[in-house]
Amino acid sequence: YIGAAAKHTPEAFFHGNIDEVRVWDIALTVDQLRYVMNQEIEENSTFVAGSYLISKSVTPTKNDISSVPWSKLAGYYPMSIYTYTNTKDQSGNGHQGALRNLRTVDRQTAPLPYQSTQDGDWDNSNTWINGDVQTIPGTTSIVDNSLSINWNLVRTTHNVTIDDDSDLPSANGGNRSVLGLFVDSNEITI
């Protein structure tokens, strides 16, 4: 079971949303997992690639997933194609996923990528689409406050101001990093 604990009968259900599930035949490194965390994936010349970066025709210098063969992906369920109570395996391996105890399909709130929704301060949740349910991009980890989350993809179309670094670990020296920053229109002011 995914989203519940059980051997035979599910219990202790996960209270939240699951945007997609990936099953690998290889142990990925922490950096590889982070690289694809905020983007869907696709096959690119028999290797795994981040869909958002491909759509932008960007090949970042920090491409931690580029050496992982697509064939090592046993199952990929982006939860975007449903047939009754099943979800399609986008890995190409034909491992259809069965959805159980699902009462509703919610809108996608995963930051793929994070996107601005209005002019405002970077650290204000109202500046971001789904900012009320997602943490601010490029800020401190909610698990380890000595770690800055620097693997987010961010797309802005508004005037965004960064003038407060108080939520960053002191080791950052006031610097904020993200995996990819796309300023499609307007400006980011620091």
Name each model-derived stretch.
Residues 1-18, 56-68:
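Extracellular glycan-interaction patches encoded by glycine-rich segments
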Residues 7-8, 14, 29-37, 64, ...:
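Polyanion-binding and phosphate-handling cores
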Residues 85, 109-190:
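Extracellular beta-sheet-rich ligand-binding/adhesion modules
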Residues 18, 73-74, 178:
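Core-facing hydrophobic residues within beta-strands of well-ordered domains
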Residues 20-32, 36-46:
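Acidic, glycine-rich loop-and-strand cores that form catalytic or ligand-binding grooves
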Residues 2, 18-24, 77-78:
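Short hydrophobic/aromatic patches on beta-strands that form ligand-binding or substrate-lining surfaces
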